[in-house]
Amino acid sequence: MLSNEQMLCIIVTFVMISINEQITAEMWSANMYLAMSFYMEKEGFCGMAHWLKKQWAEENEHACSLADYVIKRGGKAKVDKLDVVPNDFGTPLEVFEQVYKHECRVSEMIDKLV
């Protein structure tokens, strides 16, 4: 049988792993938004490109906030290998449908984390 101290150590380790997975997800999201921004700029949708760059900055901020949380508690914040993001996104409507689906997925991840 595990002691309370051992159980606490297991829980803390699990939480730190989960937060680091979220950091990686936030960084992937940032890369996706940046790729979308570049794509929309190329397609001539400068306003949409600007908004997507704002989302890129927001995702970076989320990742940094999570990393700060881990570090301040003596943990090791890390970004695991990031999957390649797509570079072609279709019409502006398709871009924002992808944004919506992605935000729903990330929100689910956050809900599971907390």
What are these regions (language model features)?
Residues 36-81:
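Conserved alpha-helical segments that form or flank metal/cofactor-binding pockets of metalloenzymes
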Residues 3-4, 75, 111:
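Generic cytosolic/nucleocytoplasmic N-terminal low-complexity/intrinsically disordered segments
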Residues 18-25, 29, 33-36, 68, ...:
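Acidic/histidine-rich alpha-helical segments that form the ligand environment
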Residues 4-5, 9, 27, 38, ...:
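Mixed-charge, polar/low-complexity N-terminal
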Residues 15, 45-48, 92:
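Residue-level recognition of alpha-helical structural elements
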Residues 3-22:
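Disorder-to-helix initiation segments
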Residues 11, 43, 85-88:
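Juxtamembrane/interface segments of multi-pass membrane proteins
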